[in-house]
Amino acid sequence: MKAKNILYLIAALLLGKSLSAQVQSTWESINERGYPQWFSDAKLGIFIHWGVYSVPAYASLEGYAEWYYRGLMTNDDRKTFQERIYGKNFQYEDFAPMWKAELWNPDEWAELFQKSGAKYVLLVSKHHDGFCLWPSQYAPKWNSVELGPKRDICGELTEAVRKKGLKMGFYYSLPEWKSDIHRWYVDPDENIGEYVDTHMIPQFKELVTRYKPTVLFTDGEWRNTAEQWHATELISWYYNTVGKDAIVNDRWGEGQQHGFRTPEYSAGITLTDRPWAECRGLGRSFGLNRNEPLENYMTSDELIRHFCVLVAAGGGMTVNVGPAADGKIPLLQQERLLDLGRWLDVNGEAIYGTRPYKKFYEMKPVKVARSEQQIDFDWKRNSPDPAISCDHFQAHWQGVFHCPADTYTFEIQTDDQARLVIDDKEVIDTQKGKTGKMKLAQGQHRIEVFYEEDDLEATIHLLWSSKTMEKQVMTNFQQGAMLPAMGLKATYTSEQPTVCYTQGKNALYAIALDYPEDQLILNIDEPAPSMKVRLLGTVKDLPWKYKDGKLFIDTSGLKYSDLRSTAAWVFQMK
């Protein structure tokens, strides 16, 4: 046996011993146990948000439909919608008996998830509204067995998923909006102790004891500490109860020190000491949002490419479906999953069980230029253009405006960094302050705005005011003194991956996100002369040469009829 294989065997034995050892309720003991390897190897899981909120299935265009009850609490447009459709006396609780799940077939779901290429499933067992999808004794008359479907959804789906050889897990909301003991977002956060002790902990243990889920994804932790949630007590108890394959996520409150990372609608993570999987919907909501436009949904090609980007950085993806109240997963969502599964049927060896290469990507600069009438944007979790990355992009606006003589107050509202320059003078740098004043003469003035988006939400608004003018968004721009076109000249730039790398035990994989018509050029170390290159899904070796620090793979001999993939093409080098 080779020395390298012996080391792998020793490491596996040590990890197995650590995972099976009794875990104490301390962060040190929990972290010493570590994480099961299966999760890092799996790469792909399915999230399911299905509940009472699936009856109204409504939110703003970018909103979370599963937060419907919170919208009623804050009197947002969901309350207006409910009163218009169901009447002023209608209550959220009245949706529960309307949730019939009359077309639900758990075996049908499990087959779809298996065909998607997923290795685990996460069902929302209880969201923040407190409604349980199992017969919880701690939610009398507010569970799926007594109301609505009249079925043990957690139990039936667990059985169906495990029959397909997939691992089953649950999402579980730590707090509740409707609890009689403590109402999340209403009662003081520091008063949550009784709720945790008498309701959350026993219900958590009831769920785990009944179904032994392999994955636990807790949520709603952010207003309290890990100590208040009794995180170490619950995690250690869960690990000791379920065993070596069990894994938890990282949402356990301030001070948590364990769990796989769960970036939400992001570009993922590039450096972490823990396993991670981005969680996201196929659209912009987790629960089904009937108000959501088609353009909010990822295309199949976008889904495949995004998944490759995450895996190349060492992570994975838990992609969400939002079934309708009748139990059917919308056909568009099914199509996306099946397309991803077909791609994995051809290219799975470059995904499952792989590790990051020493460089994740080959990057290319992307630029989009257009006119904008004003700087008044709330892209939320989107980008200004599909070609631009959702995180880490730059924007530059320039033009001219006219104004009467006055002293003006300018304001930039943004969650990131921006600068305002007028007539070559810096008026605002948001790192120093959000507002700035400038005395302007009557006439024309040059304006430039620079914006650096970091991650998550993307928002920028440019406003102005004076003693004679109320604060308002700046408008009526021109692109230059000699250019009559209205608006600002806008330029958006970012870098996007064009090739993703992964590595298996015996091969390096280059996943091309743009099809290389004649050749694929890779900036990697010089390979052994005996290396063979093959496009997955084909049988013939491709010619290659190495020159000036670059690998050139000749793809000119490939025919369209040779290709068995769309969206991304995997070149195996071994």
What is each model feature region?
Residues 1-4, 16, 163, 319, ...:
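Generic cytosolic/nucleocytoplasmic N-terminal low-complexity/intrinsically disordered segments
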Residues 366-492:
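Acidic/polar, compositionally biased interaction segments
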Residues 20, 53, 177, 326, ...:
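Generic "edge-of-domain/loop-turn" microfeature
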Residues 2-4, 322-323, 329-335, 422-425, ...:
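Composition- and surface-driven signal marking solvent-exposed, interaction-prone regions
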Residues 1-23:
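Bacterial Sec-dependent N-terminal signal peptides
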Residues 22-367, 487-574:
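Mature catalytic domains of secreted/periplasmic carbohydrate-active enzymes
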